[in-house]
């Protein structure tokens, strides 16, 4: 990694990876802290991405063999991507803590931890589907709405879990992350209730899905903490 000092030529600054704008060692320490904070944001993105893909594919696969049809429509898939994009982008400005030791990419451990969390998220959606089908008699066109709302709500709460290596309440998320999460929750509560572009559920059922998603997903913080500690994340 090339390092240029403040009085270096423009050519040297342009080719360097880091430019020290002040004298002394403090600026070097600050650069290391910033780089480790950036790594933590990237790690959160990777864990969230892997967990999301595992959960999404698992729900579609198990749901198809269970109900013998797609449990999420093409429009629902598009809306899910839309909801996830904003919260994913907001990770770039999230509040994170730098580590005291150098960071390394341990792909195996990251994948194993993400796989375990993804499987738990699959079970969460299946439980919500079971409750909706057998206790609230949700079938037909309403089932894809139920699955969509659960996946969207769970994705918003999931990022609040995986962004923090300790307990999820150990640090406050960034403002952009909180705003995007709140906005997505409100938007899809309205979509699910009024049925503007998707089949509607009653407001009570939408709130039930929101509550179950919050309960199950935030409950994942306990196995997440153990997994991250075990795999050195």
Where are these regions (language model features)?
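Short glycine-aspartate micro-motif
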Residues: 2
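C-terminal transmembrane module of polytopic membrane proteins
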Residues: 133, 137, 145-233
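Membrane-embedded transport module
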Residues: 5-167, 193-194
């Amino acid at each position: 990694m090339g390092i240029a000092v403040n009085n270096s030529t423009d050519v040297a600054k342009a080719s360097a990876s880091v430019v020290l704008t002040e004298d002394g060692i403090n600026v070097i320490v600050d650069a290391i802290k910033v780089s480790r904070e950036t790594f933590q944001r990237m790690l959160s993105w990777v864990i969230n991405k892997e967990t999301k893909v595992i959960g999404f594919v698992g729900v579609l696969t198990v749901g198809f063999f269970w109900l013998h049809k797609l449990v999420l429509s093409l429009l629902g898939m598009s809306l899910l991507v839309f909801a996830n994009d904003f919260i994913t982008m907001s990770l770039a400005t999230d509040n994170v803590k730098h580590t005291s030791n150098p960071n390394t990419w341990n792909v195996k451990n990251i994948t194993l931890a993400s796989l375990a969390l993804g499987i738990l998220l699959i079970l969460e959606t299946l439980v919500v589907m079971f409750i909706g089908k057998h206790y609230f008699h949700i079938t037909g066109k309403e089932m894809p709405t139920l699955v969509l709302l659960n996946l969207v709500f769970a994705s918003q709460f999931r990022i609040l879990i995986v962004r923090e290596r300790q307990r999820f309440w150990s640090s406050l998320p960034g403002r952009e992350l909180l705003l995007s999460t709140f906005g997505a929750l409100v938007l899809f509560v309205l979509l699910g209730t009024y049925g503007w572009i998707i089949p509607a559920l009653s407001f009570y059922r939408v709130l039930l899905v929101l509550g179950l998603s919050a309960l199950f997903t935030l409950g994942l913080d306990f196995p997440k903490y153990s997994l991250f500690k075990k795999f050195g994340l």
